[in-house]
């Protein structure tokens, strides 16, 4: 296997696009998918086990007894994959596949000795399809600007759930637990930037506008997090500065 995709799942039994996963797994022979069941209380475990049974060479399932939140669920999956696979590229996608598996795999070609971190961007252009509700877009741009200022980096979209890392960058970025369950993406940027230094980090990173991204309803982020998110960002900025 060359690449490993971590897919965190919390009560996703009714949202997982089974046909899309089946279509991908029946054709791709060089990518492993590791589903992390983050303490789900619905039938997520059963749905994931069906994938494991159908594609035993390409699917692994890690069941967590306690809900850790997206960031640390992804980290647990990454740590498992680092210890049990020889993959050279690691990353994650959301279970609803707002970004397709095929597009994630296409981005693996950009990971080289010189480029160790590739992240998708929901930047709408004339030649791509980015479907987001207007309100979410406006709020998202406000948050993205604040995050860019905190990082002191010209990053358009830190929060897109499509990211890829070289094996070395993976080990650096996921070495310790995250402060925030939802702003852990910001911590990834801080960790790599602090390790490499700003200039080298920028040289090793690549932000790629996605060809297709579709917002899916029933977000796991509660609206009340909009109030506590700023405190999380403050804690992250203080911890990594």
Predicted region positions:
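Hydrophobic helical membrane-anchoring modules
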Residues: 1-3, 176-241
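Short, conserved active-site loop motifs that form the nucleotide-linked donor/cofactor pocket
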Residues: 3, 31, 58-60, 115
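Short beta-strand/loop segment that forms part of the nucleotide-sugar
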Residues: 7, 30-40, 62-64
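Short, well-formed alpha-helical segments that are part of the catalytic scaffolds
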Residues: 12-26
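Acidic helix N-cap motif at the loop->helix transition within catalytic regions
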Residues: 14-18, 42-51
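A conserved acidic beta->alpha catalytic loop
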Residues: 37-46, 97
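Acceptor/aglycone-binding surface of glycosyltransferases and processive sugar-polymer synthases
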Residues: 64-81, 89, 101-182, 216-224
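Short beta-strand-to-loop acidic/aromatic patch adjacent to the donor-nucleotide binding site
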Residues: 86-98
């Amino acid at each position: 296997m060359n690449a490993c995709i971590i897919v965190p799942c919390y009560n996703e039994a009714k949202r997982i696009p089974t046909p899309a996963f089946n279509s991908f797994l029946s054709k791709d022979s060089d990518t492993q998918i590791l589903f992390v069941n983050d303490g789900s209380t619905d039938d997520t475990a059963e749905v994931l086990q069906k994938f494991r049974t159908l594609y035993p060479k390409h699917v692994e399932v890690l069941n967590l007894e306690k809900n850790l939140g997206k960031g640390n669920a992804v980290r647990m999956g990454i740590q498992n994959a680092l210890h049990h696979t020889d993959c050279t590229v690691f990353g994650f996608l959301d279970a609803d596949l707002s970004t397709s598996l095929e597009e994630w795999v296409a981005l693996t070609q950009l990971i080289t000795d010189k480029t160790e971190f590739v992240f998708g961007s929901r930047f709408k252009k004339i030649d791509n399809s980015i479907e987001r509700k207007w309100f979410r877009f406006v709020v998202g741009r406000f948050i993205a600007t604040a995050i860019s200022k905190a990082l002191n980096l010209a990053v358009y979209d830190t929060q897109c759930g499509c990211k890829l890392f070289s094996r070395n960058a993976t080990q650096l970025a996921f070495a310790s637990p995250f402060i925030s369950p939802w702003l852990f993406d910001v911590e990834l940027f801080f960790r790599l930037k602090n390790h490499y230094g700003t200039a080298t980090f920028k040289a090793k990173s690549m932000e790629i506008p996605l060809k297709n991204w579709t917002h899916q309803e029933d977000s796991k982020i509660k609206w009340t997090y909009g109030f506590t998110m700023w405190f999380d960002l403050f804690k992250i900025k203080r911890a990594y500065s």
